[in-house]
């Protein structure tokens, strides 16, 4: 795809009244004609049967092979004119793919998937290469990526020069290169962050094939898995100067909703400031008779803003958490305004649903992990070690299910590394979501 200069005349107004025009424009004449061989000129003219527009040329029009200098596309009334600026390569088939960019002036009916093809040699190359790109972490397609194809390439070509061919990736992750000559190619996929058409940032989504691709008379298909080697760092918004009230050390208990403690989670205190000092002896968990609960673990997380109380929570049990005023202090030596006591209870079994998953055709040798996602965030991951898995106390809600093939068996998804030629770990997102109902036996058969 190239950055294409484009100009056009003022739009011709559509007539009012009558039935809606649903007929796309028709190509009447192409000069030189479509599939011309031994092409020598630098101008192409397309004449249609009605007034047309060319929409979003930069996005919709692909020129292959990729020229060094962009052609100029001009449209006026019923005519599209293309001026080729770049020197054409001998014995090469060129394709100018307009996609759905050419539309009629009245109702924007597209002249669908139109490609103007010509050759500077005596034949038109007609080989194709199709494939699919999926995001490795999710197993889902991403149509914002593009497929890149190189001739006469080495490992560094994708980092140093623009590709010879580019293909769009559709909503299903599929792509097709057309009008190729027989030969050896290298294929990649890229979400191009800076428009340079090269892989130059580890935060760009990228995919590569393990070996060269041979394009021959018998068509082949390629499957690529894209990844970001490094996650883009989120921009931290500027912080307004705190008022005196905001500077006070405060915290919020979690869970805060009705103070119902999940049986498998820690009770947490979320502080507004980073803690400097932290005294576990001044944070006490008791029962309702004021008997101290032994065997708990109190810890501070790496951000030094979350205090966690870990305990084996029996069902439907009431607790008190007593926090002394000087139990914690922040970097400005602020203490809590006062000592505080929280009353809460652990949940009952009826607050949960029972879940049983039965797996068919799952490859345990690939170390599968079942991931439960809520609002696109992984809330639980469980290694699959057999054909059945169950949990009697599963938090109700709607979950997206994902199977991660954890190659290095570390429990998390790992990206690829192009320099080391390491492919990313792969995952599959299941089509059907899982709904867990409280106080209910929930079951799902998963056929992979």
Map each language-model feature to its residues:
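Structured interaction patches on ligand/partner-binding surfaces of diverse proteins
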Residues: 112-113, 192-232, 337-340, 348-350, ...
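Acidic, low-complexity Ser/Thr/Gly/Pro-rich repeat segments typical of extracellular/periplasmic
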Residues: 8-172, 176-190, 202-217, 232-354, ...
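Beta-strand C-termini and the immediately following turn/loop, strongest in propeller blades
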Residues: 360-362, 405
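Short S/T/G/P-rich N-terminal loop/turn motif that feeds into the first structured element of a domain
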Residues: 364-366
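Sec-dependent bacterial lipoprotein signal peptides
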Residues: 1-9
């Amino acid at each position: 795809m190239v950055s294409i200069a484009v100009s056009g005349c003022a739009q011709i107004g559509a007539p009012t009244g009558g039935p809606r025009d649903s007929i796309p424009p028709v190509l009447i004449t192409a000069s030189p004609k479509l599939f011309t061989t031994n092409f020598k000129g630098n101008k192409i003219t397309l004449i249609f049967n009605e007034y047309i527009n060319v929409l979003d040329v930069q996005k919709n029009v692909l020129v292959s092979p990729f020229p060094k200098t962009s052609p100029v596309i001009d449209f006026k009334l019923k005519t599209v004119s293309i001026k080729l600026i770049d020197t054409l390569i001998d014995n090469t088939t060129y394709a100018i793919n307009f996609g759905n960019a050419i539309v009629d002036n009245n109702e924007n009916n597209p002249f669908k998937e139109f490609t103007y093809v010509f050759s500077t040699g005596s034949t038109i190359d007609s080989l194709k290469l199709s494939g699919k790109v999926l995001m490795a972490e999710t197993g889902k397609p991403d149509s914002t990526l593009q497929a890149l194809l190189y001739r006469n390439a080495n490992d560094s070509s994708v980092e140093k020069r623009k590709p010879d061919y580019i293909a769009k990736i559709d909503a299903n992750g599929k792509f097709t290169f057309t009008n190729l000559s027989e030969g050896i190619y290298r294929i990649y996929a890229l979400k191009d962050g800076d428009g340079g058409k090269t892989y130059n940032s580890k935060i760009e989504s990228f995919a590569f094939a393990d070996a060269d691709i041979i394009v021959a008379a018998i068509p082949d298909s390629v499957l690529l898995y894209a990844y970001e080697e490094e996650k883009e760092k989120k921009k931290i918004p500027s912080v307004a100067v705190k008022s005196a009230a905001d500077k006070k050390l405060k915290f919020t208990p979690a869970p805060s909703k009705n103070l119902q403690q999940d049986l498998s989670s820690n009770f947490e205190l979320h502080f507004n400031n980073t803690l400097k000092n932290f005294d576990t002896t001044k944070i006490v968990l008791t029962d309702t008779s004021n008997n101290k609960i032994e065997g708990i673990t109190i810890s501070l997380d790496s951000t030094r803003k979350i205090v966690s109380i870990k305990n084996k929570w029996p069902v439907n049990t009431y607790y008190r958490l007593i926090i002394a005023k000087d139990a914690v202090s922040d970097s400005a030596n602020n203490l809590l305004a006062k000592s505080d006591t929280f009353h809460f209870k652990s949940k009952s079994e009826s607050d949960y649903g029972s879940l049983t998953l039965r797996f068919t055709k799952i490859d345990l040798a690939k170390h599968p992990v079942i991931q439960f996602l809520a609002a696109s965030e992984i809330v639980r991951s469980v290694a699959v070690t057999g054909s059945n898995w169950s949990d009697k106390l599963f938090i109700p809600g709607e979950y997206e299910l994902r199977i991660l093939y954890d190659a290095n068996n570390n429990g998390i998804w790992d990206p690829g590394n192009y320099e080391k030629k390491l492919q990313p770990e792969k995952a599959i997102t299941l089509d059907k979501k899982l709904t867990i109902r409280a106080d209910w036996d929930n079951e799902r058969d998963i056929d992979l």
